[in-house]
Amino acid sequence: MIRHRPFGSGHPYAVDTEQRSPVDPVAGEPLVLGVRTSAEVESVVLEWERDGVAEAPVALERVPRSSRGQVVDGGHLASAQARLARASGGWRVTLDDLVADERIRYRFTGDGGGRAQSTRWFETTVARWTASGVGPAVDGVDRVVAGSVHRLVRGDETLRVRFALPLAPGERVVGFGERFDTLDHRGLALDSAVFEQYKSQGAHRRTYLPMPFAHVVGGVGWGFHVRTSRRVWFDVGASTPDALVVEAETGPDGELALGLYDGDPRTVLRRFLDEVGRPEELPDWVFRLWASGNEWNTQAEVMRQAELHREHDVPLGSIVIEAWSDESTFTTWRDARAKVADGAEPRRLADFEFPEHGAWPDPKGMVDELHRRDVRLVLWQIPLIKMRPHPAGQVKADADAAIRDGVLIREEAPDGTLRPYRNRGWWFPLGLMPDLTDERAAHWWTEKRRYLVEEIGVDGFKTDGGEHAWGRELVYLDGRRGDEKNNVFPVHYAKAFGDLMRRSGKAPVTFSRAGFTGSQAHGTFWAGDENSTWEAFRWSLYAGLNAASSGIVYWGWDLAGFSGDVPTAELYLRSAAAAAFVPIMQYHSEFNHHRTPSRDRTPWNIAERSGDERVLPVFRRFAQLRERLVPYLAEEARRAVTAGEPLMRPLFFDAPHAHEAFAHPFQWMLGDALLVAPVVEEGAGSVRAWLPDGEWVDAFRGTRHTGGVVERDVPIDEAAVWIRADAVDRFAGVFV
């Protein structure tokens, strides 16, 4: 076997062994060509031509087997990612001195085992960067730096546009969607690619939910939106301190639109949301405590956990069940029995028999009982048809119907024909992917789940995944390619399930981790997979503040992390104190193969594991406080949605010129009346907080303060929260 894939897998941050890099060769830059071979191949030679003239064959060098991707924490998600990340070795060659516009034709021949094997011939043309007098189409006051526009062209096609925007001394740049590493991005470089980075997003500086939008604050006040769904790179003063350099992929015509907005952060965000879609007000119950654990995978366990919340007097608003399904169709409850049906047909509750001793003997009865307890139920989803191991039964019928009915994203086969795209990511590899950007396909997909809402009574869906569309060459049902549509897939994924909820007469509650520009209008979000560490705690708060700056209203994170061993009692309680004052308060834990001791993030398990008797009463105190805050949160969310403002608001929204707003990056306003300053360092017993101008009242102690820096000791059972003095009456009976 000898294989070369010019585009590779489409992984945005890695070069595959068998790909061409860069995919589009550029004059003056080295071009690396790689192949992967079977073990018997002993040598590989590149045959190639330049503008039809044969060049001397070049021998490839062997690439050693990589050790990257080794499993370090034993989790099933880590194992899956590691299997994909490990490279099996291959061959590569580097070509230099490429000339603009020359056509390169090449193939590879490998020898070994007594025979030669060759790939087919591949062709590409060398692109070049050239200065251009035509920049992006600007809507607003034109800030594009004169002479900064360049285009990457190949023949008559434009591949990318690069230009610069000015940065004045003292200006800060905030936003870009959900970003984990910092609040002010000046001095850094980043890009806008939807990507599933399993844990440590802040260290890798990658995100599930990017947006090519940001605020520039601290000067005259402005913001920008690169109006594209294609990938964009931002050099935010990293290379040139006084310039924000933007490089964007384009279509062949080279057109690119740029929105520039003058004004304070509220004005900038409002204008951005007017373009891309305002958030929709969701029911009050989303502000109550969300609880889940991946090992809550039976009806008995779900009800046991619900009962434990009641027994320990911890208010519970909703339960998220991840491992509820057969793990193949994601429409059928595990252990349920049903005849194999046409995969296009919506299921009905009457289709299923639920064995008395199965995992879910009466899912409808379970949901009814939860509703009687005023607890909502959210079910997990993934936008894939599982194809490994080889499908059988209902999942095979589903796959056959999806192919027959033409509802899948496709890719080009080597012979140029189109075939169903097979997931190239590490999670559910080779799965089929419905084109949820297409209304017909989205309806086809979600109707199969309608019985869960209308007959079982489910209140929402955890729309997990959404990052599985890899490759610019993918073909969507409207004919557009992956370079243009992969990023917006998760937006349509959440919309599709929100539309299902609406059709069924319920609020469009979805709980997503992936998204892009336009996600603001679709449901709630959490910050994805993270470890139980103090560093991850801080990364998650940065993520929430950047997401809020980009217009996400309903956001939370797995408080104290979900992966690895349980958090310390201190981390758990400090995280709970912070989570009580963000839009979504929820805890969750990763699958641990049901090993003991349990890694559940319930307060009673953390209390047992840590041996710290403070855990349960302190968590209870914050959960009960959260319950009393729900009316305030609902009212402030309504105002935020109407006004186009964040609910969890970084301080620069109120004081864009104040240095202190960035000197205290982990503070925020929750609505108009509460200022929150969490403890985010291990062993810290106090915080140094900054209060904007005005009168403030300590929420827990009643002491009054004027604006400025305040030092406050923070016992483990308190949070550093201040109320605007003119709003104290709104919190009568809340902080008790």
Describe each PLM feature range:
Residues 1-167:
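Glycan-association/targeting regions that enable binding to alpha-glucans and other polysaccharides
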Residues 43, 108, 173, 212-213, ...:
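Beta-sheet entry/capping signal
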Residues 110-286, 293-295, 299, 306-311, ...:
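Catalytic and substrate-binding clefts that recognize carbohydrates or anionic sugar/phosphate headgroups
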Residues 222, 231-234, 295-299, 325-331, ...:
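Flexible loop/turn segments at secondary-structure boundaries
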Residues 227, 292, 317-324, 355, ...:
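Generic beta-strand/beta-sheet core signal
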Residues 280-460, 465-478:
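Aromatic-lined carbohydrate-binding/catalytic grooves of carbohydrate-active enzymes
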Residues 292, 298-304, 308-311, 364, ...:
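Gly/Pro-rich turn-and-neighbor structural signature
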Residues 498-500, 507-509, 515-526, 539-540, ...:
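Catalytic core of carbohydrate-active enzymes
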